[in-house]
Structure formats: structure tokens, C-alpha cells
């Protein structure tokens, strides 16, 4: 699922990225980059993969497939990591989130566009090979995903969520409704 609606400004330059048709720029990449750095911007990033991993061995599975210590993440924390093969060759980069609202240990793994199927298959294969107790679910087609970035992001989102965003730092997350949707 994505927003899959044409941009309001039909002059947006479109591109195919990982099988997803999306706007790559509206005005200019330089102008948009500066706007996000100085204020805030929102992006439909539904083309990014969304894989959840939960269960007693979830952190162990992700820890063996990424370069960071996923088990060190507290609920509500995230980390940037590389995904490598057995020889240490980098396959992809990712952000791994330890979800805050889960009763059990649950992580959200975000592979790059078009890599979710390969990452999912790899997780399943290694889970079986290593005999780990973890549930792996590819949720890429289930949810739209919007990134809101920039220093004014809390102000932009503040009116549409009851979550206190002022206490969040880089690579931290909170669970809650945005514009009435969980």
C-alpha cells in the first residue's frame, strides 16, 4: 500500500524507483533539500520495505544479519545498520526500530526499495538454518509510510497527534495516532 495518489502539483518530475512510480522533485532537489534542513518536509516512503521480526530470538536474528547490536536497543529506539553477507560484503543499509508499543519484543526492519522480498527470504532462511524462534512478516504492502523530517517536524505534526514529540531525539520513536490513524 502507498498513498498511490498523483502529487497535488502535477508538474512534479516522476521516476520509477524499485518498481514504484514516485515524484523525485517538485521544484528542485536543491530547494527541497534546503527546505527540509531549515524547516520540515514530508515524503511518501511507502516504497521502502517494512519487515517485522518478533519473538524470543528476534534480536538475535537481526543481530546476526546486521552490523549493529540490535539487542542493545530499548523499546522506542532505532539504529542505522549495514546488512552484509557471510564475507562481510554490504548488501544494503537499513534502520532497525525496537517498537515501543509491543507487549513482546518486536522490531521493524526497513530495507531499501525493491529489497524487501530478498531480505524477507534471507531472514526466513537464516531463522531456519540457525534454529531461532522468531516470527518474520513482510508488511510492505500492508501500510503506507510517510517520513516527516527536519527541525520543524514536531510543529508540523503537533496539531495532528497526541504524542509528545518534544522529548524525542534522533533515532527515537513513539507509538500513537496521527490524524486519527494508528
Predicted features by range, described:
Residues 1-182:
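Basic, glycine/lysine-rich polyanion-binding surfaces/domains
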